[in-house]
From Swiss-Prot:
GTP 1 binds at residues 11-18, 58-62, 121-124. Associates with the 50S ribosomal subunit. This is GTPase Der. The keyword 4Fe-4S does not apply. The lineage of its organism: Bacteria, Pseudomonadati, Verrucomicrobiota, Verrucomicrobiia, Verrucomicrobiales. It comes from Akkermansia muciniphila (strain ATCC BAA-835 / DSM 22959 / JCM 33894 / BCRC 81048 / CCUG 64013 / CIP 107961 / Muc).
Length: 464
């Protein structure tokens, strides 16, 4: 197997590493995360701007909130880059003076034999390219002025990287994977899990969708024995409907039916990019509905609540009153997926079904509405000023949030789901109520209906 080199992006916070990473990864989403909660702040993705294959890695968070206590963190993260990378891109903000963190990272990188290219970011105008200034004193000969915000300098970077990759024997990308015959990039299908308790109307919903004249469909067995994957094309976008309906295990006991239904739903939820939670509103929201909704929340999946059999729900009342009562029930009983919009349908009559894919498209579009690192930190700091965290029970200690960043797991390759990583004094002090407060603030500033807001808190000791 041919060696695919790794290129590490290092630098202190707020110099533009995330923007550079996204440009190189060909993504307009926040940084792709390899293994959330396991790999600390190392993020990776294939590089899209080069002709030769390589992987880019971001060691985000080096020296967040400078203090004497972070010297070891700087060294540890730089060590990760040195031990795993074939080339290091050291990012600096060309508009700022060198900081102690910049100097510390440079000192550590100079001790290695790994080649380093200085990326002098935020050079939005050509006149900024003329003055290398104090950056020349870092001891690295190779440098590129660029602007991640405007795309300046990336052609030069790609050319420089391809020259290096050729020397390292990196294969051309076409040698690794076959290009589509028509030369066009094929859109990734969005996997949609249709889940819910038995008799909620999942089969009727899928049948109503497949009667749409815009469909191109053939049934093939799914990767599990308890689901059917149904390819479906809607307005040029491919989907895969993961249909758990019609696969009800034979059972003489309703309790067994409930258990097996939940098992099938859980498998479908894990595979899906977005879930359609089908509720029989005429029968009311049940414990089984709440259980399946809980799995969706635990898996951190985008979701739409399909309020089915709406035509049978208080049919003599006005639609406005019925919708108000449905919303009250859904928000009360399924509060833990409050981020999920709901759609009232009658699947048997195919009413409301046409709205589903419009909402999915809107969720996918607005899922990219993510704050930058700077915007996120300003929002978090303002939220703390407006409503400071309370003291822990039986203690005078209070939560302190030092720094925050955003990561997106690569398994969310069609609808990105952000994970907001909070670096705090003690993660045990982050209460559910304060987490919900921060979620609400993020949703107010960066609305993304259908997308969960997930926090990952990490304790950091500061000597200040």
């Amino acid at each position: 197997m041919q060696h695919v080199p790794t290129i590490a992006i290092v630098g202190r916070p707020n110099v533009g590493k995330s923007a550079i990473f996204n440009r190189m990864a060909g993504r307009r989403i926040a940084i792709v995360h390899d293994e959330p909660g396991v790999t600390r702040d190392r993020l990776s993705a294939p590089c899209k701007i080069t002709d030769r294959a390589c992987k880019i890695m971001d060691t985000g968070g080096i020296g967040a909130r400078l203090s004497d206590g972070f010297a070891e963190q700087v060294e540890a993260e730089a060590d990760i880059a040195i031990k795993t990378a074939d080339l290091i891109l050291f990012v600096l903000d060309c508009r700022d003076h060198l900081t102690p963190i910049d100097q510390s990272i440079a000192d550590h990188l100079r001790k290695s034999d790994i080649p380093v290219i200085l990326l002098l970011n935020k050079a939005d105008h050509e006149k900024q390219d003329l003055n290398l200034g104090e950056f020349a004193g870092l001891g690295f000969d190779d440098h590129i002025f660029l602007s991640a915000a405007h795309g300046r300098g990336f052609s030069e970077l790609a050319s420089r990287l391809d020259g290096f990759l050729k020397q390292k024997g990196a294969p051309l990308k076409e040698e690794l994977e076959e290009e589509p015959e028509n030369g066009e990039e094929t859109a990734l299908p969005i996997k949609v899990a249709v889940v819910g308790r038995p008799n909620a109307g999942k089969s009727s919903l899928v049948n109503a969708i497949l009667r749409d004249r815009r469909t191109i469909v053939s049934n093939v067995a799914g990767t599990t024995r308890d689901a059917i994957d149904v390819p479906y094309l809607h307005d040029g976008q491919p989907y895969v409907l993961i249909d758990t309906a019609g696969m009800r295990p034979r059972s003489r006991r309703d309790t067994s039916v409930e258990v097996f239904s939940a098992m099938r739903s859980e498998k479908a939820i894990r595979r899906a990019d977005i879930c359609l939670l089908v509720i029989d509103i005429a029968a009311g929201i049940t414990q089984q509905d709440r259980r399946i909704a809980g799995i969706i929340a635990e898996e951190g999946k985008p979701c739409i609540i399909i309020v089915n059999k709406f035509d049978l729900f208080h049919p003599n009342a006005s639609r406005k009153d019925r919708m108000a009562e449905v919303e009250e029930q859904v928000r009360r009983e399924l509060f833990f997926i409050s981020y999920a919009p709901f759609i009232a349908t009658s699947a048997k009559k195919a009413e409301g079904v046409e709205i589903i894919f419009k909402v999915i498209t809107r969720i996918r579009r607005e899922s990219h509405n993510l704050p930058t690192t700077g915007q996120l930190n300003r929002l978090i700091q303002l939220a703390q000023q407006m409503n400071p965290p309370g003291a822990a029970s039986g203690s005078a200690r209070r939560l302190k949030i030092y720094y925050a960043t955003t990561a997106v797991d690569p398994k969310y390759n069609t609808i990105p789901v952000p994970r907001y990583v909070l670096f705090v004094n003690d993660k045990s002090l982050l209460t559910d109520s304060y987490s919900q407060y921060l979620r609400n603030k993020i949703r107010e500033a960066y609305p993304a209906p259908g997308i969960p807001v997930i926090f990952s808190a990490r304790s950091r000791v500061r000597n200040d």
